[in-house]
Amino acid sequence: MKRKVPNIIITGVPGSGKSTLCEELKEIINKELLKRNDMEGFEMTHLNLSNIIKDERLYKEFDDELDASIYSEELLNEYLKKKYKLEKGGYIIDFHDINFVKDVDIIDKIFLLTIQTNFLYERLEKRNYTKEKIKNNIECEIFQVIKEDILDHFPNTNILQEIENNDLQQYDNNLSIIKNWVLSYI
């Protein structure tokens, strides 16, 4: 049975603009839902999984070289199952990895934000990422690691839409693309 509101994943390497886009997207879509009589009581919720993992300590170890925690898929899934009803829909899931998804049927669409490496380098440098961490993320973008993970993990390749997110014009266009997809689902 189709959910009344979809679950979407916004993914991409760190620095591709996921969290900023997700937060604004949530606000825009929820304003649209308020205008519709048939959507009373429904709203989209932004789940920033990186923040949840950090705040709830859902990691198994720390990688000193990359200055990053290695999250536990098991702990994350237990937490999500206990705290949220993903099967009901209404979630904008913001994360750089999709391998945590055990039930692929709970996801209706994946938007993969891509970014040119020169823009990515600048954004990660502004975040004071280590040289090794910047190199690792740029290599992930060049070799399309996240896209390959999605295609390996989800049998329905129509679930994926790639969108480039280098500048403000593309950002605004991406907001519109995703908003329109969500509203057409409803």
Swiss-Prot record:
Enzyme class at the top of the EC tree: transferase
The protein's location, in the record's own words, is: Cytoplasm; Nucleus
Catalytic reactions on record: AMP + ATP = 2 ADP; ATP + H2O = ADP + phosphate + H(+)
Region annotation NMPbind: where it falls in the sequence: 48-71
Family label: Belongs to the adenylate kinase family. AK6 subfamily.
User: What is said about its interaction partners and assembly?
Assistant: Monomer and homodimer. Interacts with small ribosomal subunit protein uS11. Not a structural component of 43S pre-ribosomes, but transiently interacts with them by binding to uS11.
Q: What's the protein name?
A: Adenylate kinase isoenzyme 6 homolog
